[in-house]
């Protein structure tokens, strides 16, 4: 024990007299380990604490406080009581000791065994004996005071409330004059606790407001590389929570807000309006009443006069909050309706008459103000719409110019579109005892609104028609505003526009509107629109080349109509009842295209497939649609494509369903639908697809008239043969959930492997490889997967090692897709496969193909190995791949022959181009020399990929560019005259981006760049000239005032 005491005395001596700061940590460790106690430490410090030298006393208190900061949780109540008494006494000591005393009290304030009454005692001592103001204490000491307050408010709230207004007065004195942003955040937290936790403000309400509001509005801007990470937004939100926390501040805050809204500083205006909006959530109409005219005047002025969207948006938000607050007021028989009074001020004295002016100059700011007010509550929407909508309807009917009518209709749309606050409360009718339908504020104008919308849809003005579709959509979203007759009229108008309107903007708006209405009123579209679209799609075809030539523009026009009809069918098909009617129409188009009876083009067939895929997306949310695709659509697609593949060439007609582009368009239809299937249907789909492709089982296909011996996975010489249907097998089995077991998996993989390695057709062997990859990616780890991988990779290696083999490209394609499948799931074997790929970069025959293969590895695949298809895709796999392999790539580049270096550069550009921007910036210093080398490569693909990677990175002005600017400018300017248009455009974008670097860095290159840009300014391609003009404009202004 004596030895421990000697150790402690030694530590104290070295710290106090020897100025060895590290001994504080040793002392803390001794206390934590039980070698000695805190009270023993106090005893050991006795001589130091009673020294006549303030510095010596300060070192003693400093040691004790540092130990307490580490060991406060182990103190007993008695020890805490003794220490608090000691520290309170020390607050009266020399000022050099005060900082250490405050740190000790900060530690003690966190103790869970704080004795009763000690919290009050601590605060009284601080308020009486410490001058917290900025002139007296340093930043860290003031921070200690605020942290003590926060800790005690958390643990001893009731004791502090017992201090009453004395606590508020003490805090006000402490925070007065604070300017450090770190401490302000703490002070605002204390003030917020005072307000929100019900402390008695007493007679110090105004003082508390004054001591916090003096910082409003916040104009703090953090210095560059601020280590504390405090933002202006943090301070703004913290102060706003204080100022708007109690209605007792209203009489002081609202005049201040009015004053600050008149400021010339935009940020002050915006902050003031946002603060006013926050007031509306906590104040009642009583606090607002006196100041409403002044607030309204300021808001109106800013919305009418500002050119800033931020100021306008903040003003409208503030107005909406005020109206919402007034709407919550309870009406008494002997009091006026404050909401009605305020809205009368808004409507009659300022805004309403602007809607009726002949030139409609101020219609938009007036409309925005009125819409913000009306959208704030149900009561406000009642008052606003009853006053405004009749005037708008009258104006619309009295105007003859389409532009004015469009403006009025757009304004009307803002009032028709409901906001969450303007809807009536669920189950509560705000209009006496009427039904739910009558609760809509627009019921009284239902017929007039429909008449205006249908009239606008009948106009010839495209802008008016587009706006009318938006108003119609808004009306349809509110129950009861469209009667059955109105819905039918709307469908008829929309159908007419789809069939007749050639303006692309109108067509798009009509199709979108049709989709919205069809979701709510499917029966009307099934009975009225779909039959007409079907008739137009399947009739009126021109059959022969001569007839097409003679028809000219008429033929082109009918094709455009059919495209609109097909797009509309997809848009309206979000409900099962519509899908069951629309999808057969699209299937009928595919059937007609296959048989050749109507002469549909490949482009039209692809458009039909795209529409089917858009419909299939709804299967994710609607099981009935998914089941319909499983039962009807997918078997029909498989049957049609199989018929087309088996069709004899002697028939004189080659079905467009054998076209690779069409098959590629069918793949997402099937994969989207299969990915959404429920487990039972998914298992059945897997069994049917595998039995079809392995055994030729066509029993589940409609119109089953196929030969008895079908072998779709058998490699064929005919590129349009059944083997290309492997893409549909992939769509069926590789998009199913991972929990679905694929039957005959090993047998299927063997046949797919044979097809991928022996087929002479790129389309067939690529999709066979993708199918293998999709299955391998989802297969559980274990012996079965290892056996498959061993077999596949052995065959791939044999083919690749045989340089005379005619199937090396096929083997490489299989390798790259299997490598991707394993990379995505972090399989251990993926490292060996990527090493194999790196070794192939120097292959004279495959090198360029392998380099492009890295694009496959790093890019998202749209048809397989993606999350939509339930693939096993781990996060950040690209970053991991880059981290593990970038050094191998650089080493390979350095050791490669000059003729083969371009393959490494191309691979590098593909990898870097697909990395997240943050990773690119981090790795740029190491990779920039190689990227510059890539710009000198003769391969235009390498150039374009590298430029695509560089351009977004240059916008971030990375420091790594400082030493490489000369080389970068030389290469980029040379590429502005490249033979490839895309390379010229990309290099000009990079040159443009370089103009945004710090002026002192790029100013020396200005004359050189402007001279080099003369050639692309005269380029024969318009898009190149456009990029050159943009770049030259920035470089020309460089160095000029305001440039």
UniProtKB/Swiss-Prot annotation:
UniProt cross-references to InterPro entries, sorted A to Z: ARM-like (IPR011989), ARM-type_fold (IPR016024), MMS19 (IPR039920), MMS19_C (IPR024687), MMS19_N (IPR029240)
The HEAT repeat ranges on this chain: 879-917, 921-959, 962-1000, 1003-1041
Quaternary structure, from the entry: Component of the CIA complex.
GO cellular component, one term: MMXD complex
Function statement: Key component of the cytosolic iron-sulfur protein assembly (CIA) complex, a multiprotein complex that mediates the incorporation of iron-sulfur cluster into apoproteins specifically involved in DNA metabolism and genomic integrity. In the CIA complex, MMS19 acts as an adapter between early-acting CIA components and a subset of cellular target iron-sulfur proteins.
Annotated protein name in UniProt: MMS19 nucleotide excision repair protein homolog
Keyword presence, DNA repair: yes
Gene: mms19
This protein's record includes keyword Signal: no
Lineage: Eukaryota, Metazoa, Chordata, Craniata, Vertebrata
Record keywords: Cytoplasm, Cytoskeleton, DNA damage, DNA repair, Nucleus, Repeat
Pfam families documented for this protein: MMS19_C (PF12460), MMS19_N (PF14500)
Disulfide partners: none
TM annotation in the entry: none
Range of residues in the leader sequence: none
Family designation: Belongs to the MET18/MMS19 family.
One of the GO BP terms on file: protein maturation
Coiled-coil intervals, chain numbering: none
Compartmental location: Nucleus; Cytoplasm, Cytoskeleton, Spindle
